[in-house]
Amino acid sequence: MDQYEVLEQIGKGAFGSALLVRHKLEKKKYVLKKIRLARQTDRTRRSAHQEMQLIATVRNPFIVEYKDSWVEKGCYVCIVIGYCEGGDMAEAIKRANGTYFSEEKLCKWLVQLLMALDYLHANHILHRDVKCSNIFIARDQSIRLGDFGLAKILTSDDLASSVVGTPSYMCPELLADIPYGTKSDIWSLGCCIYEMTALRPAFKAFDMQALINKITKSIVSPLPTKYSGAFRGLIKSMLRKSPEHRPSAAQLLKHPQLQPYVLQVQLKSSPTRNILPIHQSLTDKVKKMTFPSDVVDSARRRMARRNSLGNERTVTFSKPSPERNSVSSTRSIKEYTTTQSVEGLSVDSSEAGDEVTSKAIITKTSSILRTPKSLPAKTYTARNQLEPPKTSYNRTYRSELPSKTTPNKIARPARRASLPLSTYETPTKRSISILEQLDSPDVSVNAPRIDRIAEFPLASSEDPLLPIHNKLSPGHGSCSTPPFINRSITKDKCTIQVLRTDGDNGSDSSGRNATAASSRGSNDSRQQRFDTSSFQQRAEALEGLLEFSAQLLQQERYEELGILLKPFGPEKASPRETAIWLTKSFKETAS
């Protein structure tokens, strides 16, 4: 006692008093707890000695710090513990004066109290007096659990039966005179958290019998709606009537609502402390973020795709092997940002595919074949069009490549890159299967131009039916014919398509006129009177129009079909004139 200077008395109870003292050498404040032994029962004396021994053995950052203890003149048990400048939680609730604590602060406090209880329960210690006046707040707003005067050390499967504690925080099994275990502390902590949340006791009554009835029936008022449903449900789970249905401290620390705060508390706590839940969570976290270097290549690719959507911290544990052809997860994350920004734009599919392919080539390793970035998509040969998907296999998203579209699939509504695809399937296999159906690589070269021309009926199927000239904007790029295109293939293809439509609908005058137009186009004398490029564009425009009309007919969208075919009536312009008008529109767009 000579080492301490008494400053003031800060508390007084039935069994003793609490004094604020300062260590004369350290100049640090402590709390001296003096428990009177004179004129006390043997049970009270044993309890005082037990508290002195127990608090000297426990070591946890969220339990009051033990400094010293002794028995003074056989009349007092003196225990020196750390001083918490914030006072106890009961005083903090009074100071709040109706202003609710934030959910974040309550979650942090709850995590710290659960860690303290989990430490005690793992060492077979029951606190038995968890209440707001025994929860202390340190200067940094962290929590300390104190007052082990009623604590009990259990054997492995032992239960307590003594009716001790504060009535408002007693669990139903204790009031029913049923042996109780560690779940009684969970109930008491639930009462404390309820009081800290609602700023009122969980159970309150005018007499003892009414209080017992409320506790045994677990009747509590609703918590403030200011807090989330998950947090309120967490508190209610701690106040379940049956102890078997109440979660343990370790189970509560694994609750998704508290997991972020468990990690925050672990980072701030001292690494020398023995905290079982924090150590376990840290171990699990490290296991999740560690990549073994000897896994097979397919598993590594799946891991890289999964981690590219996670946080940046996962990348530091990545260990790509030197023989791996794909980029590492670090590059995958960087490229995910740029790819997502490109695909988020509503652009033509060929332009989006060209941009995404170019970015994949930049980050590709030297062992993979490179494709020049400056080449436009419509000048690729059939073999070159297969290379970009190989380099972009490990990308998070992919855009539909336009050069893989055959003429019989022009009306498929999947040509724009405005919506990112959620699948991770590589587009290479699909591209190979489509190209195997083509006899000539010239048709594949011609595919991007056909894709842009067919954009006019495609937009009509996705949006309400609009005039044709609204769809022919300069954003679709040039529609001029490359010099190396085999025109005979295009002309024959157009004739076959039109004849098929004519066979299906022989009484249609527009079908006969279209067939006659294609027959006239095959005549050399007729072909000399028309520009070859205009004829080709008109034929393909009519092809797209007929295919879209067939699609509307198949979908029984007769009203839209009538609007579309209205210009082809007997009193309207002929199909030939309409085709010429379409050709002029394409020429104006190209110029």
UniProtKB/Swiss-Prot annotation:
Residues 391-408, 504-534 have a biased composition (Polar residues). It is an enzyme of class 2 (transferase). CDD domains: STKc_Nek (cd08215). InterPro entries: Kinase-like_dom_sf (IPR011009), NEK_Ser/Thr_kinase (IPR050660), Prot_kinase_dom (IPR000719), Protein_kinase_ATP_BS (IPR017441), Ser/Thr_kinase_AS (IPR008271). Its EC number is 2.7.11.1. Residues 4-258 form the Protein kinase domain. Pfam families: Pkinase. Keywords: ATP-binding, Kinase, Nucleotide-binding, Serine/threonine-protein kinase, Transferase. This is Serine/threonine-protein kinase Nek2. It comes from Oryza sativa subsp. indica (Rice).
